Amino acid sequence: MRLIIKNDSCEAGEYISQVIKKRINDYFLNRKSGDNRPFVIGLPTGSSPLPIYKRLIEMNKNKEISFQEVVTFNMDEYVGLESNHKFSYHYFMWENFFNHIDIKKENINILNGTTDNHENECKLYEEKIQSYGGIDLFLGGMGVDGHIAFNEPGSSLSSRTRIKTLTRDTIIANSRFFNNINQVPTQALTVGVGTIMDAREIILIVTGHSKAIALYRTIEEGVNHMWTASAIQMHKKSIIVCDEDATAELKVKTYKYFKQVESNSNY
């Protein structure tokens, strides 16, 4: 596991944007003749990835990267919100990313939170991921309690896509988007920790002092289902990109180690 420490959230977003650009461009550069498999990426919502999406949009407009052969799978969606609801993750992704890049609509995959059969929706989502040969890169964020996607504390670290009841802490944290805590849905469909761990590469963005304890638990303590993001310690190719504020709880030795190790590293 790598830890990349940047000065602020803008620098962290820029770094991750460059990684994504390199991974996508390298994939198509090295793809064998006759192989039509697209690049498959998992995507999050929330405030943390916004600088990343903004930068990728700029790169796309400048023709530094194309999404025409990229397939996306979003991490989660609220149960009960229509796709055109302004607080749904469908709406968020189209408003902040998909409407501004050259991606094909049929290559966009987001869980349907209004389906009558949640179990079947989740089963089909897993099957569709596998039909593409798995996810090449999963981009994610981290909650203040160390959750990844909507895999709340106590979630199985081998879990697959399913319906989850949200914790009070998550509901409170997400109420800033709804302006009223009573409007925040109490359930969501989410990819599982196991689904994320199956990706060939995982990148987490962690910014802000509020994430400091979660980052400490994820990096310096053992793998623990009460801090689901800690599972990435077991992944063979994972990167956490954070800002200085998020390192507040790390030991000085840990901080210096990663700063030294990554000082001369590339993407």
Swiss-Prot record:
Pfam families found in the cross-reference section: Glucosamine_iso (PF01182)
Keywords from UniProt, A to Z, are: Carbohydrate metabolism, Cytoplasm, Hydrolase
Pathway the protein contributes to: Nucleotide-sugar biosynthesis; UDP-N-acetyl-alpha-D-glucosamine biosynthesis; alpha-D-glucosamine 6-phosphate from D-fructose 6-phosphate: step 1/1
What does the record give as EC number?
3.5.99.6
The record's listing under InterPro entries reads: Glc/Gal-6P_isomerase, Glucosamine6P_isomerase, Glucosamine6P_isomerase_CS, NagB/RpiA_transferase-like
Q: Does the keyword tRNA processing apply?
A: no
One GO location term (cellular component): cytoplasm
- Annotated signal peptide: none
Active site per UniProt: 76 (proton acceptor), 145 (for ring-opening step), 147 (proton acceptor), 152 (for ring-opening step)
Q: Which Gene3D superfamilies match?
A: 3.40.50.1360
Write down the top EC class of this protein: hydrolase
**What does the UniProt record say this protein does?**
Catalyzes the reversible conversion of alpha-D-glucosamine 6-phosphate (GlcN-6P) into beta-D-fructose 6-phosphate (Fru-6P) and ammonium ion, a regulatory reaction step in de novo uridine diphosphate-N-acetyl-alpha-D-glucosamine (UDP-GlcNAc) biosynthesis via hexosamine pathway.
Subunit structure as annotated in this protein's UniProt entry? Homohexamer.
NCBIfam families referenced in this protein's UniProt entry, alphabetically: nagB
* PANTHER family referenced in this protein's UniProt entry, alphabetically: GLUCOSAMINE-6-PHOSPHATE ISOMERASE
- This protein's name: Glucosamine-6-phosphate deaminase
Question: In which organism is this protein found?
Answer: Dictyostelium discoideum
Q: Which gene encodes it?
A: gnpda1
